[in-house]
Amino acid sequence: MLLDENPGTLIHHTIGNFNIQPDKQAVTRINDSLSTLQQSRELRMREAESSLRKLSRHLHSLNAQHEEAVAAHDSSKHAADMVELDTKKFRIAKAATELEIESERLESELEMLKERLADLEAQGLEGDEATRRERELDDATILRLKIYRSLGVDIEADDAGNFNKAVIRNSRKGDVHVVNIDPKFSRFFYSNYFWSTMQG
């Protein structure tokens, strides 16, 4: 046979190079983040509603005390109660404003996460078109390099990633030939040269 390894085995190894696990994990993390964010938002809203109810009850109690103070015609106590009521009202208004701002921020963050999730779902587990093309190109290159290596040819790349050197081993003779690949010669020329060197 021309190949040292069974083609089916080579193809099986090539399939193993496809890795969609990071994309699946990213989708899972986003879903978990959305769920956690929703739970956190609901908890904050419940806490805020509980706090507002407590403050409302307290305000009602203070209003009752204020009415009693007015009925008793105690002007000094009345003035003090009014100051306290104004302070409580200010705190309640401030707390309500902060809760509203936080709610808007959480809603905005939730929308961003939903958009991100929609983008990932639209791309699918294989990623977007550019990612798929790059992976397919890399997989084809890896397959070719494995085939060359099985034939006794190691292709070496320079710092720029260009394959410009081939090391050809003739196992029958124990020879090793190093060939610098020049773009001015055709692929057909190098194919014939490699083949004759391996068979020579």
Swiss-Prot record:
Q: Which SUPFAM superfamilies does the entry link to? A: Kinetochore globular domain
**Signal peptide span:** none
Gene Ontology MF annotations: microtubule binding
InterPro entries for the chain: Ndc80_Spc24, Spc24_Fungi_globular_sf
| CDD domains associated with the record | RWD_Spc24
Per the similarity annotation, which family is this? Belongs to the SPC24 family.
Subunit info here reads: Component of the NDC80 complex, which consists of ndc80, nuf2, spc24 and spc25.
Q: What does this protein do?
A: Acts as a component of the essential kinetochore-associated NDC80 complex, which is required for chromosome segregation and spindle checkpoint activity.
Q: What is this protein called?
A: Probable kinetochore protein spc24
